[in-house]
């Protein structure tokens, strides 16, 4: 009898261990659906949330990865064909979709203060500014981010982790998703943040060329350079307006400049950077002494960095040095992704901060929120870890022609519009650099009526500041409405 009990105990233990092991391995396909409602702009919006996985197949049709997504569908809409679908990606590469999902466009947002700083208790609340009133949304986690995983360990990782590979498999995945949820008739939009802008710019063309899917709009939130070269004088000049914005925020400029409106001042700095500073920098070591000194003096006036230090750096202050130098005398660094944030280093000396002060703050608040939200609100229960940043390296960065891809997609599709959203205090993907990217996308000037830029008084994730959360979502609504063709309007030049 004792032996039988021991055998049963062993079998029970093995069965439990097996179940736990299964829970730690992502499955190719599963979904959980729940029903909710949220008040947006004062009106109740009923919606269905479906979260789960959809496979990525190799060329033989074998499932090799599971991509996790969350799809929000407004349920009181009769004309589904006319209802826009927004497909959302974050960046990294390697970042989950949590950032825009739980802080920007989704129906729930994390609990933070009005400037975006963490507060306790952690959790989520209704988002009265979500775009779900105007469009359905799917948030996608590329392979190895969020709950997405490789499920065939023998698969070549190069299938997923590179500029071109990423775009290729995700285009195929989007085709399958749109087919499964029956949204081919719907106007479709891509939104990407940071590296996600490289992704969606490439997807705009890949979807057209390989999946025969034409979209209505691309929204670039804090865009990368999209493969457009800006080394040398261009990069050194275009970062000055960001320096001015960060210095203005921290009261490091002259009283005259501090008393001016930020955007008014930035327009002046932009003009100087393009029209005067860039030609000086183009002369390199052959610039005259007086011209060099005058440029250093003007840069110091706009950046809050001393003229002496600027001259020591040959008029080329790197962003990482700026983050360390701006508040050095006060004993602080400033954040890379959002320079409103301050950090404290081990020592005030050095040429770059010890850590990104804004990122630790964001992880502080986002990680508890996303784990709580999936398990307790969406009823998605798993022992798999949500990868805020997943293992996707080495990442093949060769072949990044995403800016040109976007231009080609827009040229081939008269319906396609693009909007850029940037925060003035973003030191990683600087706002004036984003403007420069927009200018370079279309050298012909024939697409500029379909290209637009919006700036915000915050950083990389401008939506963390409540005032910008409201306006940025309104700008997306307006963009969607503007870019929808009138009934019967043909796609032609």
Where are these regions (language model features)?
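N-terminal cap/lid subdomain of alpha/beta-hydrolase-fold enzymes
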Residues: 61-161, 439
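Conserved acidic catalytic loop of the alpha/beta-hydrolase fold
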Residues: 168-186
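Alpha/beta-hydrolase fold nucleophile elbow
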Residues: 183-195
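Glycine-rich nucleophile elbow surrounding the catalytic serine of serine-hydrolase chemistry
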Residues: 192-205
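Alpha/beta-hydrolase fold catalytic core
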Residues: 284-429
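Short alpha-helix in the alpha/beta-hydrolase fold that links the catalytic acid
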Residues: 416, 430-440
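Catalytic histidine-centered segment of alpha/beta-hydrolase-like enzymes
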Residues: 457-468
């Amino acid at each position: 009898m004792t032996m039988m009990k021991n055998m049963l105990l062993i079998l029970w233990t093995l069965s439990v261990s097996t179940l736990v092991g299964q829970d730690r391995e992502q499955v190719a396909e599963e979904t959980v659906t729940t029903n909710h409602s949220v008040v947006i702009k004062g009106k109740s919006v009923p919606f269905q949330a479906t979260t789960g996985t959809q496979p990525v197949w190799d060329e033989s049709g074998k499932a090799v990865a599971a991509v996790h997504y969350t799809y929000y569908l407004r349920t009181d809409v009769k004309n589904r064909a006319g209802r826009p679908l927004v497909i959302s990606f974050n960046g990294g590469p390697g970042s989950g979709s949590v950032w825009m999902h739980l802080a920007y466009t989704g129906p729930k947002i994390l609990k933070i203060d009005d400037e975006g700083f963490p507060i306790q208790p952690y959790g989520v609340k209704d988002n009265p500014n979500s775009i779900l009133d105007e469009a359905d949304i799917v948030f996608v986690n590329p392979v190895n981010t969020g709950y997405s995983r490789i499920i065939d360990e023998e698969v070549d990782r190069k299938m997923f982790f590179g500029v071109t590979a990423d775009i290729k498999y995700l285009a195929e995945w989007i085709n399958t998703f749109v087919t499964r949820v029956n949204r081919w008739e719907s106007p479709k939009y891509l939104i990407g943040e940071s590296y996600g802008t490289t992704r969606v710019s490439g997807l705009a063309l890949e979807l057209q060329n390989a999946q025969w899917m034409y979209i209505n709009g691309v929204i670039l939130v804090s865009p990368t350079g999209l493969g457009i070269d800006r080394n040398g004088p261009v990069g050194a000049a275009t970062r000055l307006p960001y320096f001015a914005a960060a210095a203005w925020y921290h009261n490091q400029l002259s009283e005259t400049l501090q008393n001016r409106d930020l955007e008014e001042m930035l327009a002046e700095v932009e003009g100087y950077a393009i029209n005067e500073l860039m030609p000086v920098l183009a002369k390199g070591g052959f610039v005259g002494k007086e011209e060099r000194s005058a440029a250093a003096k003007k840069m110091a006036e706009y950046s809050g960095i001393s003229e002496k230090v600027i001259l020591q750096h040959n008029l080329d202050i790197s962003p990482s040095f700026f983050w360390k130098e701006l508040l050095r005398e006060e004993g602080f660094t400033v954040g890379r992704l959002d320079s409103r944030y301050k950090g404290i280093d081990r020592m005030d000396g050095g040429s770059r901060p010890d850590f990104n002060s804004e990122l630790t703050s964001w992880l502080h608040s986002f990680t508890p929120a996303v784990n709580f939200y999936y398990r307790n609100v969406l009823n998605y229960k798993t022992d798999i870890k949500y990868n805020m940043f997943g293992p996707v390296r080495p990442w093949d960065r060769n072949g990044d022609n995403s800016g040109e891809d976007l231009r080609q997609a827009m040229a081939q599709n008269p319906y396609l519009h693009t909007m850029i959203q940037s925060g003035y205090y973003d030191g990683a993907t600087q706002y004036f650099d984003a403007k420069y990217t927009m200018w370079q996308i279309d050298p012909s000037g024939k697409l500029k009526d379909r290209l637009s830029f919006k700036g915000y008084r915050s950083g990389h994730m401008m939506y963390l500041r409540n005032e910008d959360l409201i306006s940025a979502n309104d700008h997306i609504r307006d963009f969607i409405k503007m870019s929808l063709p009138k009934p019967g309007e043909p796609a032609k030049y």
